[in-house]
Amino acid sequence: MATSAPVTSRTETLAKYLKLDQKGQIMAEYVWVDAAGETRSKSRTLPEKDYKAEDLPVWNFDGSSTNQAPGDNSDVYLRPCAVYPDPFRGSPNIIVLAECWNAGGTPNKFNFRHDCVKVMDTYAEDEPWFGLEQEYTLLGPDNRPYGWPTGGFPAPQGEYYCGVGTGKVVQRDIVEAHYKACLYAGIQISGTNAEVMPAQWEYQVGPCLGIEMGDQLWVSRFFLARITEEFGAKVSLHPKPIAGDWNGAGLHSNFSTKAMREEGGMKVIEEALKKLEPHHAECIAEYGEDNELRLTGRHETGSIDSFSWGVANRGTSIRAPRETAAKGYGYFEDRRPASNADPYRVTKALLQFSLA
């Protein structure tokens, strides 16, 4: 059977070209979300200036090649919605996050940002804050978790979470590169750590206000995909990449409103959870693919079939941190979203169903 050798970028050779004068031009990398819930991108040259999203030109791409449009009407338009410094090419080059729109002026079927903005605007006075914990698994050329023995398994879980040292963690260089790239670009990345399963990591983004949460998480995912590309690794957002007695991967979603963060906020949180409970099935439908493999009631998850909450309990649908309960105000954590969930869909559902 044919096999392919891992391919890594020659970044040391590329470095000398990145220093060349651009003659008053910049490179703008337009990034969008495709039909499979993954990022795509392409570049264009623009005159050098300080750009805001509204200053940037609308562009287009072949939607028939991304399963976002039919071949006989394939143009999908890219409408810029957020701009970030480019950590790969450096200043003055930019990353442009764009929404996908159809030729007829309607949002593309896979443009979940559009409806999310509407909900965020509806509840803007509540000042919704979000913080998302993105778990992911690094894979090698054989599509097995990086560093796992060929044809076998590592030692059982227990020594890997926040681990330090050879045999406990792998590919920390990818994690560090991603952390610095996010900071450079202005992503509100708040931390990172090794997770319970070997080759699994997590980073946190937030707190972010409203729509900025989804925007920043999608750009951070794009950065992660680009960085693993350079290191010859793959990143998986599958919520249960390895069957058996191994933790899955989630997108734990921390949420609060202004009223929850003030004195007496715990009562507001409890009322919000009462409103969330009857919408459990609707939330699960928005919270990612293959989540039934992860939400089993084991491995620090609640059951996919029922809604539950508790203080400092990681085996429930919703966890109220011990500190929040002790102070009487703060935030809560929705532990149901899968690692591959769309942050626009998650934050929209969480805000809409907890306040409606």
Curated annotation (Swiss-Prot):
GO terms for biological process: glutamine biosynthetic process. Residues 26-105 form the GS beta-grasp domain. Its EC number is 6.3.1.2. Pfam families: Gln-synt_C, Gln-synt_N. It catalyses: L-glutamate + NH4(+) + ATP = L-glutamine + ADP + phosphate + H(+). Keywords: ATP-binding, Cytoplasm, Ligase, Nucleotide-binding. GO terms for cellular component: cytoplasm. It comes from the Eukaryota. It is an enzyme of class 6 (ligase). GO terms for molecular function: ATP binding; glutamine synthetase activity. Residues 112-356 form the GS catalytic domain. It is found in: Cytoplasm. Homooctamer. Belongs to the glutamine synthetase family. PANTHER family: GLUTAMINE SYNTHETASE, GLUTAMINE SYNTHETASE 2 CYTOPLASMIC. This is Glutamine synthetase.
